[in-house]
Amino acid sequence: MVPFLRILGIETSCDETAAAVVERDAEGNARVLSDVVLSQLDEHSAYGGVVPEIAARAHVEALDELIEEALNRANVSLDEVDAIAATSGPGLIGGLLVGLMTGKAIARAAGKPLYAVNHLEGHALTARLTDGLAFPYLMLLVSGGHTQLILVRGVGEYQRWGTTIDDALGEAFDKTAKLLGLPYPGGPAVERMARDGNPDRFAFPRPLVGEARLDFSFSGLKTAVRQAAQDIAPISDQDVADICASFQKAISRTLKDRIGRGLQRFKTEFAATDEKPALVVAGGVAANLELRGTLQALCDKNGFRFIAPPLHLCTDNAVMIAWAGLERMATGAAPDPLDVQPRSRWPLDSNAETLIGFGKRGAKA
């Protein structure tokens, strides 16, 4: 039987600095003792996006105090923690260095094992913390850096069924917002404007709809938005609302097709499974209510459970990093050496095909 375990998690892969303490009992039940997140929204809003150097400096300034706060809120000392888990990739290399080096230093000083966690694995396993979900299941990750459909077979066992061939969905939201003069972050701003818009005014493209493969593409949709805005310039607030509503509708229809095909494939490959199949959604874009509604209806139609963890666990956080570390410990996985290096590009499925367009450095994730 797996013993009781407690772990300190650290997350610094992008523009949130986070620390958390999570414990797991012998039966696999989780308890979050603390969850501290410091957003860098104010630091980056003037630039309309994340500036890597500013992000790294902000992590340096905040991380030590956040870790201390996480331990204090959990009412535990480092001596009462069994291991350290720190995000090691993928993400912005400066931020990853800050978090991983801090994790290494704590592990060495306190004599604790270190687990270098793949950020995407944190997202992939969160539903097991919140809902006790059994393997296998599908996960749709939709964020500023990633759009992927992943089969989660087990801890450390992932198969990428689909990914974006160009822009991530969150990136498309942010760039559309910037184009229309909306504030950063773009996703919530586009969603707010869309509530007062006409979703049928603009017939935006729905990339890859109808294709058998399960990949995504959003670059062409972003270009179509730019062209529509130029064609009717100068644009009014109502024009912006209509563009946002039409943009969201195109994305909803695209996801309905792409994910619908994924659900059918899952049912075919796991026809003998007695458990009701599940689709998990994670990432900041998962907060969008229209997209959630589309996915919920799609799951209802296909006999799937739709699982969306609480928003604070969908976006970047250290709870998921701690939990991923606990899951690895529970399988008996060995800790990482203290000379482990961060990886800005770290595909969750190491056997996945590299798509055209990623360049010499390969796929980020």
Curated annotation (Swiss-Prot):
GO biological process, one term: tRNA threonylcarbamoyladenosine modification
Cofactor needs: Fe(2+)
Predominant location: cytoplasm
Binding site for substrate: L141, V142, S143, G144, G145, D174, G187, N288
EC number: 2.3.1.234
Cited InterPro entries: ATPase_NBD, Gcp-like_dom, KAE1/TsaD, TsaD
Entry GO terms, CC: cytoplasm
Cofactor note: Binds 1 Fe(2+) ion per subunit.
Compartments where found: Cytoplasm
Keyword vocabulary terms for this entry: Acyltransferase, Cytoplasm, Iron, Metal-binding, Transferase, tRNA processing
Single annotated GO MF: N(6)-L-threonylcarbamoyladenine synthase activity
This protein's record includes keyword Transmembrane: no
Reaction(s) the record says it catalyses: L-threonylcarbamoyladenylate + adenosine(37) in tRNA = N(6)-L-threonylcarbamoyladenosine(37) in tRNA + AMP + H(+)
SUPFAM superfamilies recorded: Actin-like ATPase domain
Residues annotated for Fe cation binding in this entry: H119, H123, D316
Keyword Protease in annotation: no
UniProt cross-references to Pfam families, sorted A to Z: TsaD
UniProt similarity note: Belongs to the KAE1 / TsaD family.
Its job: Required for the formation of a threonylcarbamoyl group on adenosine at position 37 (t(6)A37) in tRNAs that read codons beginning with adenine. Is involved in the transfer of the threonylcarbamoyl moiety of threonylcarbamoyl-AMP (TC-AMP) to the N6 group of A37, together with TsaE and TsaB. TsaD likely plays a direct catalytic role in this reaction.
Protein name listed in UniProt: tRNA N6-adenosine threonylcarbamoyltransferase
Protein encoded by which gene: tsaD
